[in-house]
């Protein structure tokens, strides 16, 4: 578990986010951990962000201001 001070917007989402993180790391061939490079870890974090934005856009569908 991460020691991040960031609060989750949805309580209980941590396990789903962790699962996504490890799936993406496996897809990218990245071993997560203290000995991983910042670039490798960052690539996983960037992909998580892209996928979460995509999921949110799909859920919002045709919503416009």
Curated annotation (Swiss-Prot):
Site (Cleavage): 23-24
More about this protein: SASP are degraded in the first minutes of spore germination and provide amino acids for both new protein synthesis and metabolism.
InterPro entries (alphabetical): SASP_alpha/beta-type (IPR001448), SASP_alpha/beta-type_CS (IPR018126), SASP_DNA-binding (IPR050847), SASP_sf_alpha/beta (IPR038300)
Lineage, highest ranks first: Bacteria, Bacillati, Bacillota, Bacilli, Bacillales
Homology family: Belongs to the alpha/beta-type SASP family.
GO BP term (any one): sporulation resulting in formation of a cellular spore
Name used for this protein in its record: Small, acid-soluble spore protein 2
Role noted for this protein: SASP are bound to spore DNA. They are double-stranded DNA-binding proteins that cause DNA to change to an a-like conformation. They protect the DNA backbone from chemical and enzymatic cleavage and are thus involved in dormant spore's high resistance to UV light.
GO molecular function: double-stranded DNA binding
Keywords: DNA-binding, Sporulation
Pfam families: SASP (PF00269)
Gene3D superfamilies per UniProt: Small, acid-soluble spore protein, alpha/beta type-like
